[in-house]
Amino acid sequence: MMREILTSRFFPSLFKKRLDFSNRVVLGLGSNLKNPLKILKNCFLYFKNHSKIGKIFSSPIYINPPFGYTKQPNFYNATIILKTSLSLRHFFALVFYIERRFGRQRKRDFKDAPRTLDIDIIAFNQVILRQNDLALPHPKWSERDSVLVPLALQQILFKKGEW
């Protein structure tokens, strides 16, 4: 069971625009199909270049084995903390759009199937919400190394003054 931490030009990365938006979002990113490093990089760049997103801070990439269905490639995971002026519903729609843009199929063959890009909204400000299509904070974030390890690495960088 291999686990590895990768760094690249964009992971970890801090980018600040002059605009400082009020909504703080924590995202979990995952990819294990096609070229996961390239997909995560391009996803980061998409968020970075979006006009409604200000600060964006990414973790290093955490490579770890899949959970659930294990006969698939390892996952490349990262977390992103960002500031946006988008409302929760508009941000949720943006996430769906980005996933589709990177080849994500919403209808999966089975639970925990491989995917080109998975973006989970872990938290949006302090919102607590339980609906059919969205639960905040994400109900299983605290059980997943794929979220906990990148968030812990971001916390270390934060304490060093990176955010």
Curated annotation (Swiss-Prot):
PROSITE patterns: HPPK. Keywords: ATP-binding, Folate biosynthesis, Kinase, Nucleotide-binding, Transferase. GO terms for molecular function: 2-amino-4-hydroxy-6-hydroxymethyldihydropteridine diphosphokinase activity; ATP binding; kinase activity. Pathway: Cofactor biosynthesis; tetrahydrofolate biosynthesis; 2-amino-4-hydroxy-6-hydroxymethyl-7,8-dihydropteridine diphosphate from 7,8-dihydroneopterin triphosphate: step 4/4. Its EC number is 2.7.6.3. Disulfide bonds: none annotated. It is an enzyme of class 2 (transferase). It catalyses: 6-hydroxymethyl-7,8-dihydropterin + ATP = (7,8-dihydropterin-6-yl)methyl diphosphate + AMP + H(+). One of its GO terms (biological process) is folic acid biosynthetic process. NCBIfam families: folK. Catalyzes the transfer of pyrophosphate from adenosine triphosphate (ATP) to 6-hydroxymethyl-7,8-dihydropterin, an enzymatic step in folate biosynthesis pathway. Belongs to the HPPK family. This is 2-amino-4-hydroxy-6-hydroxymethyldihydropteridine pyrophosphokinase. It comes from Helicobacter pylori (strain ATCC 700392 / 26695) (Campylobacter pylori). The gene is folK.
